[in-house]
A protein has these predicted regions:
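Short helix-loop "hinge" at the ATP-lid/N-box region of the Bergerat-fold HATPase_c
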Residues: 100-101
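Short conserved segment of the HATPase_c
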Residues: 132-144
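Short beta-strand/loop element within the Bergerat-fold HATPase_c
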Residues: 108-119
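Short alpha-helical segment of the dimerization/phosphotransfer core of two-component systems
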Residues: 19-27
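Conserved micro-motifs of the catalytic ATP-binding
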Residues: 39-45, 81-84
Length: 190
């Protein structure tokens, strides 16, 4: 068993080493991003008028690459303009769509928009995936709280999205009443 020659050891260990270094770099970047957002929590992002239909269609189109075969992508976003920060809104929606893609084997992933009042808008991301266990919901937005044993994440994605939502004058919540998968609601006050 211990008779592997040095060349074979190097061949085996080099890809593993590179993969671990890459994972560490990604974790360090995620930690730095989270800390930076936390330190600037009260500094809200600059907002600009933009067409959210165009943005949401584009985000969904890119996200579909990660969808499993047979998963339907649905965008129900009207052609309206709202004041927001396109880059930061895209960061949140990309993360939510990537999570949905990872845990949805069949059915659909949908992104919709609802205007709740003149100054309150919701982006609702719904999937027919595995859902989030009741016991994990409490720690969902806490840093480093992995909720699945098989996840590839670092436990900072949803907490980071929650901070970004706050800096966009909004909130990110899990719809605990939805039982056919997972539904997140990003509510922005503009």
């Amino acid at each position: 068993l211990n008779t592997i020659d040095e060349a074979t050891k190097e061949t085996i260990s080099t890809p593993i080493l590179h993969e671990n270094i890459k994972a560490l770099k990604e974790l360090m970047t995620a930690i730095q991003t989270y800390i930076s957002l936390e330190e600037t929590r009260e500094e809200h992002y600059p907002l600009k008028e933009l067409n959210i239909n165009t943005l949401c269609e584009s985000i969904m189109e890119k996200a579909k690459i990660n969808f499993k075969s047979g998963v339907e992508a649905v965008v129900n976003v009207p052609r309206v303009n709202i004041k927001t920060n396109a880059e930061e809104l895209e960061r949140i929606l990309n993360h939510l769509l990537n999570n949905a893609a990872e845990y949805t084997k069949s059915g659909k992933i949908s992104l919709e928009f609802k205007k709740r009042s003149a100054h309150t808008h919701q982006f609702i991301l719904t999937d027919t995936g595995t859902g989030i266990p009741v016991e994990a919901r409490e720690k969902l937005f806490k840093p480093f709280a992995e909720i699945r044993d098989l996840t590839q994440g670092n436990g900072l994605g949803l907490p980071t999205c929650s901070l970004i939502a706050y800096k966009l004058n909004g909130t990110l919540t899990l719809d605990t009443d939805y039982k056919k998968g997972t539904r997140f609601i990003l509510e922005l006050h503009v």
